[in-house]
């Protein structure tokens, strides 16, 4: 099983602004949006246009700022990370995805750049059949986009299942939960002049072209598979 005990993990949280190169907006109260559109033919299958706009959350079990951003091994010898997306507006073809959430759990022993990740996808239990299929396609990388570029790092897909996913933020405090599976709460770290501490351009970023806001968690728990 992938199990994460309570720890003082370092977490990331970013918002997206609509545009070709999104801008990090965490904590400023502005409406957030991320555009990602794919329209192409791959392996004989016509890929639908899709767009998701909203907030991104991430938490892991490392006890320092995520070592993977400089290709270093995790502080505990293994990384257990949960990535989550809060879709404020979105669609996949004609299927509306607004108001739904998705999460991806990843487990890697040793350096994350070496691959062999074990991953599991969690799809908002409020999604109907068409919405669940669309979310699964987008956040597994099957619909194209940046997540498809990370697919070679995955060694095993443990499964995909519906779940109640809660994602909350007020710009300074953040919380993530997958009912009965995962929970984390964290706050931003104040930098020079009271500004946010941010990291941008790291090679394993699940969303390129934006700055990640660094925070420290009060707790991180994960137990599934």
Predicted features and spans:
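Internal, well-folded beta-alpha domain core
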Residues: 99-225
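N-terminal amphipathic/hydrophobic targeting modules at extreme N-termini
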Residues: 19-26
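Extreme N-terminal basic, low-complexity initiation segments
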Residues: 2-13
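Charged/polar low-complexity intrinsically disordered segments
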Residues: 1, 17-18, 31, 40
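Short, Lys/Arg-enriched N-terminal segments with co-localized hydrophobic residues
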Residues: 28-46
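N-terminal ordered "arm"
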Residues: 48-92
């Amino acid at each position: 099983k992938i199990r994460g005990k309570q720890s003082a993990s370092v977490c990331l949280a970013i918002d997206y602004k609509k545009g070709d190169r999104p801008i990090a907006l965490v904590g400023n109260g502005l409406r957030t949006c991320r555009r990602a559109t794919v329209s192409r033919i791959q392996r004989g299958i016509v890929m639908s246009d899709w767009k998701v706009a909203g907030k991104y959350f991430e938490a892991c079990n490392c006890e320092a700022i995520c070592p993977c951003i400089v290709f270093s091994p995790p502080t505990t010898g293994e990384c257990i990370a949960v990535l989550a997306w809060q879709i404020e507006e979105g669609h996949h073809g004609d299927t509306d995805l607004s108001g739904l959430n998705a999460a991806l759990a990843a487990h890697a022993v040793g350096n994350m750049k070496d691959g062999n990740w074990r991953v599991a996808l969690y799809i908002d239990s409020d999604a109907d059949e068409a919405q669940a299929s669309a979310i699964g396609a987008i956040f597994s990388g099957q619909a194209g986009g940046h997540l498809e570029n990370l697919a070679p790092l995955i060694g095993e897909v443990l499964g995909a299942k519906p779940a109640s996913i809660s994602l909350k933020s007020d710009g300074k405090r953040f919380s993530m939960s997958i009912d009965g599976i995962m929970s984390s709460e964290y706050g931003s770290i104040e930098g020079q002049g009271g500004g946010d501490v941010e990291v941008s351009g790291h090679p394993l970023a699940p969303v390129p072209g934006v700055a990640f806001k660094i925070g420290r968690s009060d707790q991180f728990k994960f137990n599934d598979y």
